[in-house]
Swiss-Prot record:
A molecular function (GO) term: large ribosomal subunit rRNA binding
Lineage: Bacteria, Pseudomonadati, Chlorobiota, Chlorobiia, Chlorobiales
PANTHER family reported in the protein's UniProt record: 60S RIBOSOMAL PROTEIN L12, LARGE RIBOSOMAL SUBUNIT PROTEIN UL11M
NCBIfam families referenced in this protein's UniProt entry, alphabetically: L11_bact
Transmembrane segments: none
One annotated GO biological process: translation
Keywords: Methylation, Ribonucleoprotein, Ribosomal protein, RNA-binding, rRNA-binding
Posttranslational modification: One or more lysine residues are methylated.
Pfam family, one: Ribosomal_L11
Natural source organism: Chlorobium limicola (strain DSM 245 / NBRC 103803 / 6330)
Protein name as annotated: Large ribosomal subunit protein uL11
Amino acid sequence: MAKKIIGFIKLQIPAGAANPAPPVGPALGQKGVNIMEFCKQFNAKTQSEAGMITPVVITVYSDKSFTFVTKTPPAAVLLLKEAKLQKGSGEPNRNKVGTVSREQVRRIAELKMPDLNAFDLDGAEQMVMGTARSMGIIVED
């Protein structure tokens, strides 16, 4: 018989830097998951992408065991990295803070494709361009 799922936990954690401090500890502690075991497994799996924010979905089972799936970093984080910015604009419709090329947008869309609900690469590019626009980043052709 399959183990019964008692919940899902969605977190965004810096790759290779999970520790029992908030937000990881309290979220996992509520479900009774072994926090240190998760931290060790997550850090081992994501150490190659150190520093990037990595979304993770943790599935918790009735016997307090767990599995987790890591996703690609958020498009906003990838855009900030490509544009070499610290943060987006507070007023994106008035203040533009940086620019990215169409090739950079395509690269981000290719990386994000497994996690986006787009049928093709053009649709994924449009989603990434929309994220850039909402952050005050100009996309140049």
